[in-house]
Structure formats: structure tokens, C-alpha cells
């Protein structure tokens, strides 16, 4: 039996300024989840690069839960970013959003790649 994927939603906000503030809050939450994940990775692999993997089933579960939390935080941030890209017409803001996309998506991809590598080596 498979379960339907969790539907990710963000609060509705009116206006660009509240959405920009919300984007910053979502990015802060993403960064906190990234810090938690990095801390958990150091417990499972002291080198934090997949070369010295060791942990028990409980730690493996924690790593998998960290991945879900990071993905959820990234998806919420991404939903808000897409809203702003559609609604905001300020060229300075649009450039800023594109720079944030490049930075945050790279952090997300790098973290997920390392975590998946660890889980495969441990599993």
C-alpha cells in the first residue's frame, strides 16, 4: 500500500512586502533545517563526506527524517519564491530572487546528494 505524498501549502498573503518577508522566514527555516541535517551527518560520518559512515538504525531513521524536513522547508520556500516571481515587477527584486534561487537550490542539492550518499553507504 502506498500513501499519497504530503501536500505542501503555504499561507496566503496579500501584497509583495509581506510575501518578501515570508520568503525570508522560509529561507531562515530552510537554513535551520540545513544546519540540523549537517549536524546529524557529522554524527553518522565524522568526515561529513560519506567516507566514514557508521550509525545504528535509529540514526539512519533520523537522517531520513532530516531529509524530509529539509525537502519540506525547501518546497515551502520555493512556492513563495514562485509567487513572487509571478507577481513582483521590480527588476531589482527579480534579480535578487534569481540569485537566491541559485544559492538556495545549490545548498539543497548538495545536502540531499551527501545525505543520499550516506544513506546508501550505511543501508
Region roles according to the model:
Residues 1-123:
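Extended alpha-helical scaffold segments
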Amino acid at each position: 500500500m502506498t500513501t499519497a505524498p504530503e501536500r505542501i501549502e503555504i499561507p496566503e498573503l496579500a501584497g509583495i512586502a509581506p510575501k518578501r518577508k515570508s520568503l525570508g522566514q522560509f529561507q531562515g527555516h530552510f537554513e535551520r533545517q540545513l544546519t540540523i541535517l549537517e549536524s546529524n551527518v557529522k554524527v553518522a560520518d565524522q568526515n561529513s563526506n560519506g567516507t566514514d559512515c557508521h550509525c545504528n538504525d535509529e540514526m539512519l531513521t533520523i537522517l531520513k527524517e532530516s531529509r524530509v524536513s529539509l525537502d519540506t522547508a525547501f518546497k515551502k520556500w520555493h512556492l513563495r519564491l514562485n509567487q513572487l516571481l509571478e507577481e513582483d515587477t521590480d527588476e531589482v527584486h527579480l534579480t535578487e530572487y534569481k540569485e537566491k534561487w541559485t544559492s538556495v537550490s545549490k545548498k539543497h542539492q548538495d545536502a540531499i546528494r551527501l545525505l543520499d550518499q550516506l544513506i546508501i553507504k550505511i543501508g
